[in-house]
């Protein structure tokens, strides 16, 4: 990566080292995990986290099922030793000066006397800089400037699209596709019918032969636009099909370059599996390698420098929050539950990849804690606990009294107390922003969640396979989307009285869609491993029960189609303007579905966290950007 001078700070040698190499030159931050097909605890298992039998403790004599999950892969000493100079005031001061300079670049699109700049490419200039600051993860500093720029573009928006400039005679695909995407994401009323201007009489998108770089970028922006589709938008489906095919063909012909890297990233992560911090990391690399993509050379340099500084400054905050989370985890006694998945580092990484504003610390930590708790609870209810123990635990948690632990098995006592104390802690945190005690509201969500888990535990115990609808309705609740999301959302600086909160929480359409999405997508990635552990019920098996003669492939095709439809409905729920839900809360709730979807791109990234998930942690949490 090229060096970028940020004098006077560039003299510091720390700027030229990655975080990993500067802290532990020879010791990796993670442990090497043996192949999951190894023999463990004296039992032979299959390569996909199969069922194994063990006792809860040497003296309880109870035979139990366990999911043979790999242990926490991250080295505690390494995490506690993390350190970076980017928390020092000098870096923040430099970033603040750069923010002022970038604002001047926004404002320079108007002349000093208020007249407009050249009409040659004034629309595309505005779209480019707005798109760039958003992809670089620094848009929060330029809210007013972004609004002014997009108001200007919208003023010249026509039914057949726009050209590069306000006086352009001919509309072009690049400006129109990028404009449509950006305006829609910011709540402007724009119709996808505008894309029909670039189709022929047969509905095929028209492109000039040769696949020039400019044309490829146009189709790339068409692809990005097509992913922000609402239900029933046929032209968006056609745009996605065309652009997907076109870009795949282009990748076979163009050389390896920053453009090909950008195409691969966009096609791999799209919209609904993309994460703001991961995109910032990738787009910094892309812009640095390909200055030809800069419409404004001065702006490009300033944006890159600011984005790198912001990435590394936030990294210093991530380290402190992760170190706090590690202490919470160790003090909770949860590490003693060796049968459970311990993924606190991974969950914090997800939280910090979507909540990239430094002031949302309570959200990041709350989400990481909630996700870790529901993962441990999932392992207790699905595999380790006996039906009698689970009934005891469910009854005790509903009474919400710490004295209830006296009636529980030893291994459940610490779990009960961590749930009890963490929910109460987040209730106090939420009271700071909401001005009221939300515990009773939150407890109802947890009670429904435990009831759904208890129902599934009975299915496993009785060998019962429900019909698809019964399984799906219960599975929405047991997906844990609601309990993982509710309290973190309440810590945001967004006023959410109960009547507004119910617009994104239960029983809202938004919550139903998000919970359904997580259940369906999770099952398509986990059903084989779950079946090997003795959990027969899944969306796949229940669909096949409802449809005798159908195959697993039939079931997967049906469920994948449901998932694609849900994503479009979630897009609509996020961007529709006729509700009174603060966008801050709605966007974070939406981004949680993106974060969880990201872990399911290739496999169950919760359970198998030593592959793609490890790469995400390294790139967005443990490695800083080089200058």
From Swiss-Prot:
An example of a Gene Ontology cellular component annotation for this protein is: chloroplast
Q: Name one GO molecular function term.
A: magnesium ion binding
The compartments listed are: Plastid, Chloroplast
Q: What is its EC number?
A: 4.2.3.15
Gene3D superfamilies from the UniProt entry:
Farnesyl Diphosphate Synthase, Terpene synthase, N-terminal domain
Q: Which residues bind Mg(2+) 3?
A: 530
PANTHER family given for it? (E,E)-GERANYLLINALOOL SYNTHASE (PTHR31739:SF25), ENT-COPALYL DIPHOSPHATE SYNTHASE, CHLOROPLASTIC (PTHR31739)
Span(s) of short sequence motif DDXXD motif: 378-382
Q: Which gene encodes it?
A: ag2
Q: Which residues are noted in the entry as Mg(2+) 1-binding?
A: 378, 382
**Entry's Gene Ontology BP terms:** diterpenoid biosynthetic process
The record's cofactor note says: Binds 3 Mg(2+) or Mn(2+) ions per subunit.
Q: Which organism is it from?
A: Abies grandis
Q: Which InterPro entries match?
A: Isoprenoid_synthase_dom_sf (IPR008949), Terpene_cyclase-like_1_C (IPR034741), Terpene_cyclase_plant_C1 (IPR044814), Terpene_synth_N (IPR001906), Terpene_synth_N_sf (IPR036965), Terpene_synthase-like (IPR050148), Terpene_synthase_metal-bd (IPR005630), Terpenoid_cyclase/PrenylTrfase (IPR008930)
Binding annotation for Mg(2+) 2: 378, 382
Q: Which reaction does it catalyse?
A: (2E)-geranyl diphosphate = beta-myrcene + diphosphate
Per the entry, what span does the transit peptide take up?
1-52
Q: What does this protein do?
A: Involved in defensive oleoresin formation in conifers in response to insect attack or other injury. Involved in monoterpene (C10) olefins biosynthesis.
Q: Which UniProt keywords apply?
A: Chloroplast, Lyase, Magnesium, Manganese, Metal-binding, Plastid, Transit peptide
Domain commentary = The Asp-Asp-Xaa-Xaa-Asp/Glu (DDXXD/E) motif is important for the catalytic activity, presumably through binding to Mg(2+).
**Name of the featured protein:** Myrcene synthase, chloroplastic
**A Pfam entry, by short name:** Terpene_synth
The family line of this record is: Belongs to the terpene synthase family. Tpsd subfamily.
The pathway noted for it is:
Terpene metabolism; oleoresin biosynthesis
């Amino acid at each position: 990566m090229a060096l970028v001078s940020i004098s006077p700070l560039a003299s510091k040698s720390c700027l030229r080292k990655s975080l990993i190499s500067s802290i532990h030159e020879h010791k990796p931050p993670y442990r090497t995990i043996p192949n999951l097909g190894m023999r463990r605890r004296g039992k032979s298992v299959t390569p996909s986290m199969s069922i194994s039998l063990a006792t809860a403790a040497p003296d309880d004599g109870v035979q139990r099922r366990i999911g043979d999950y790999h242990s926490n892969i991250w080295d505690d000493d390494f995490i506690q030793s993390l350190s970076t100079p980017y928390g020092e005031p000098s870096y923040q001061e430099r970033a603040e000066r750069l923010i002022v300079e970038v604002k001047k670049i926004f404002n320079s699109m108007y002349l000093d006397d208020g007249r407009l700049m050249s009409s040659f490419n004034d629309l595309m200039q505005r779209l480019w800089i707005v798109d760039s600051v958003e992809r670089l993860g620094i848009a929060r500093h330029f809210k007013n400037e972004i609004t002014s720029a997009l108001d200007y573009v919208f003023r010249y928006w026509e039914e057949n699209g726009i050209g590069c400039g306000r006086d352009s005679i001919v509309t072009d695909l690049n400006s129109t596709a990028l404009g449509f995407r950006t305006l829609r994401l910011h709540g402007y009323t724009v119709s996808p019918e505008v894309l029909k201007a670039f189709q022929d009489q047969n509905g095929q998108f028209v492109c000039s032969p040769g696949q020039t770089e400019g044309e490829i970028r146009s189709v790339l922006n068409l692809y990005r636009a097509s992913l922000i589709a609402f239900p029933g938008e046929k032209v968006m489906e056609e745009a996605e099909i065309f652009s997907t095919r076109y870009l795949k063909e282009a990748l076979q012909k163009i050389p390896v370059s920053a453009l090909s890297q950008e195409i691969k990233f966009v096609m791999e992560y799209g919209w609904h599996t993309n994460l703001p911090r991961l995109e910032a990391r990738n787009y910094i690399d892309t812009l640095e390698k390909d200055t030809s993509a800069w419409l404004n050379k001065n702006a490009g340099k300033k944006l890159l420098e600011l984005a790198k500084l912001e990435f590394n400054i936030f990294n210093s905050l991530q380290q402190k929050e992760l170190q706090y989370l590690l202490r919470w985890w160790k003090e909770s006694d949860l590490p003693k539950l060796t049968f459970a998945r311990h993924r606190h580092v991974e969950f914090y990484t997800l939280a910090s990849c979507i909540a990239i504003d430094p002031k949302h610390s309570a959200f990041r930590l709350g989400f990481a804690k909630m996700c870790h708790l529901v993962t441990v609870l999932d392992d207790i209810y699905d595999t380790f606990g006996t039906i009698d123990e689970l009934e005891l635990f469910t009854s005790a948690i509903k009474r919400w009294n710490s004295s209830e632990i006296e009636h529980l098995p030893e291994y459940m006592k610490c779990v009960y107390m961590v749930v009890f104390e963490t929910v109460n802690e987040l209730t106090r945190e939420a009271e700071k922003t909401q001005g009221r005690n939300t515990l009773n509201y939150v407890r109802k969500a947890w009670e429904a969640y435990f009831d759904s888990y208890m129902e599934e535990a009975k299915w496993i115990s009785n060998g019962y396979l429900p019909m698809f609808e019964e399984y799906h309705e219960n599975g929405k609740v047991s997906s844990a989307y609601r309990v993982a999301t509710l309290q973190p959302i309440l810590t945001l600086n967004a006023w959410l009285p109960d009547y507004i909160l119910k617009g994104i929480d239960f029983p809202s359409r938004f919550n139903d869609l998000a919970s359904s999405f997580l259940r369906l997508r999770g099952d398509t990635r986990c059903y084989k491993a779950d079946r090997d552990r003795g959990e027969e019920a899944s969306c796949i098996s229940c669909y096949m029960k409802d449809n005798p003669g159908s195959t697993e492939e039939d079931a997967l095709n049906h469920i994948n189609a449901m998932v694609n439809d849900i994503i479009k409905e979630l897009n609509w729920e996020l961007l529709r303007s006729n509700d009174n839900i603060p966008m801050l809360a709605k966007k974070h709730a939406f981004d949680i579905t993106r974060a969880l979807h990201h872990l399911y791109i290739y496999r169950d990234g919760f359970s198998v966290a030593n592959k793609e998930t490890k790469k995400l942690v390294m790139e967005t949490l443990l490695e800083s950007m080089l200058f």
